[in-house]
Swiss-Prot record:
Protein family according to the UniProt entry: Belongs to the enolase family.
Active site: E203 (proton donor), K333 (proton acceptor)
Cofactor(s) annotated in UniProt: Mg(2+)
Name of protein: Enolase
UniProt keyword Aminoacyl-tRNA synthetase, yes or no: no
GO biological process: glycolytic process
Annotated cofactor note: Binds a second Mg(2+) ion via substrate during catalysis.
InterPro entries, alphabetized: Enolase, Enolase-like_C_sf, Enolase-like_N, Enolase_C, Enolase_CS, Enolase_N
The species this protein was found in: Campylobacter hominis (strain ATCC BAA-381 / DSM 21671 / CCUG 45161 / LMG 19568 / NCTC 13146 / CH001A)
SUPFAM superfamilies: Enolase C-terminal domain-like, Enolase N-terminal domain-like
UniProt entry keywords in alphabetical sequence: Cytoplasm, Glycolysis, Lyase, Magnesium, Metal-binding, Secreted
């Protein structure tokens, strides 16, 4: 099926910043679009998000990226077969000519890459997850629900970026989603009773000013119990420390103090002994590989240790981490690497080497639910896409509810 047109426009994401929406048209009349997300806490080695840097939108306009789609990319890709995803992505990579898409912009390339996949699925009349994953795409992921926000995702006193709950003790996705929605509402009541703000952060979680980074966990434990669920058995806790944001001159600064890597690791060990923590993401900075070795040696057999800024969905960096025995899981963000093909290659490398994969949104999102299908397609087993609040977050959960009706299996207790 031949691609007859490719074009893009500048639209707004959930933070009110511009982003790229790309469209792909086919000879059978199919027209598909996709919107690119954007992160606030970003790894230094992520693919380049091309911004205009002029007066429009405080420098964050994306008209250059849009123009690249409408001209350079369209000239190269129009006329190609939409079902040749790898060839199309490789052609855009070659066209850009850099490792990090610094010429065309990863936001331009990814928008087209996503729209191509969606157009192909629509043309065939099959779900996106089935097109990308084939017959083996049948696992609904366990979500990480970010219900208290801190760090770069909220203007508050909390250093850790995300405090999440994971519903394990449920037979189906819809029951797991209901449980977390109830926990979220009970959390709101508890925060109100304690006199804390219930304003929400970028990802839909509450963003109160709390005294330290343990208090959110204590309050979440109360909310789990108040909602009628059992911590540790039905609901577990996950943290995203985003420690690169706290790293200064070889040490970590939080709660007005400085910590060495070893001291921060000991703090995590104590938290894991005290609370039912399943996962810690970016527990140390992306450049602190020696610290990561120590963290992995200490906790890899007890919890999930996720590299986000550490690996930036990059196959080469992940391979180095595997060789050095660093972390045991990877966060998967397509816009960190720039194309659907490259994302899939990274996931396959991780899975072959026993690393868990977590499909992830960004803090700047849209109503596009692509990653919900992508998580099922790649059998990642876990997905991270915010709280049960804000429609750009719920768009992904609602899409997973739709997929649940199509003979899929929820991992639940099986992780």
């Amino acid at each position: 099926m031949i691609i007859t047109d490719i074009y893009a426009q500048e639209v707004l994401d959930s933070r009110g910043n511009p982003t790229v929406r790309a469209f792909v048209a086919l000879e059978d009349g199919t027209l598909a679009g996709a919107t690119v997300p954007s992160g606030a806490s970003t790894g230094k080695r992520e693919a380049l998000e091309l911004r205009d840097g002029d007066e429009r939108f405080c420098g964050k306009g994306v008209l250059k990226a849009v123009e690249n789609v409408n001209t350079v990319i369209a000239d190269e890709i129009v006329g190609m077969n939409v079902y040749e995803q790898k060839d199309i992505d490789n052609a855009m990579k070659k066209l850009d000519g850099t490792e990090n898409y610094s010429n065309l912009g990863a936001n331009a390339v990814l928008g087209v890459s996503m729209a191509v996949a969606r157009a192909a699925a629509m043309s065939l009349g099959i779900p996106l997850y089935r097109y990308l994953g084939g017959a083996n795409a049948q696992i609904l992921p366990v979500p990480m629900f970010n219900i208290i926000n801190g760090g770069a995702h909220a203007n508050n006193s909390v250093d850790f970026q995300e405090f999440m709950v994971m519903p394990f003790g449920f037979d189906c996705f819809s029951d797991a989603l209901r449980a977390v929605a109830e926990i979220y509402q009970n959390l709101k009541k508890i925060l109100n009773e304690l006199g804390y703000s219930t304003a929400v952060g970028d990802e839909g979680g509450f963003a109160p000013n709390l005294k330290d980074n343990e208090e959110p966990i204590k309050i979440i434990m109360q909310a789990i119990k108040k909602a009628g669920y059992e911590p540790g058995k039905q609901i577990k806790i996950a943290l995203d420390v985003a420690a690169s944001e706290l790293y200064e001159n070889g040490k970590y600064r939080l709660e007005g103090k400085t910590f060495t890597s070893e001291e921060l690791i000991e703090r995590y060990v104590k938290l894991c002994e005290k609370y039912p923590i399943f996962s810690i993401e970016d527990g140390l900075g992306e450049d602190d590989w020696e610290g990561w070795k120590k963290l992995t040696a200490r906790l890899k057999d007890k919890i999930q240790l996720v590299g986000d800024d550490l690996f930036v969905t990059n196959e080469k960096i992940l391979r180095e981490g595997i060789e050095k025995g660093i972390a045991n899981a990877i966060l998967i963000k397509p816009n960190q690497i720039g194309s659907i093909t490259q994302t899939m290659q990274t996931v396959r490398l991780a899975q072959r080497n026993g690393y868990r994969c977590i499909m992830s949104h960004r803090s700047g999102e849209s109503e596009d639910s692509f990653i919900a299908d992508f998580a099922v397609a790649l059998n990642t087993g876990e997905i991270k896409t915010g709280a049960t609040s804000r429609s750009e977050r719920n768009a992904k959960y609602n899409r997973l509810l739709e997929i649940e009706c199509e003979n899929t299996e929820f991992l639940g207790n099986k992780i």
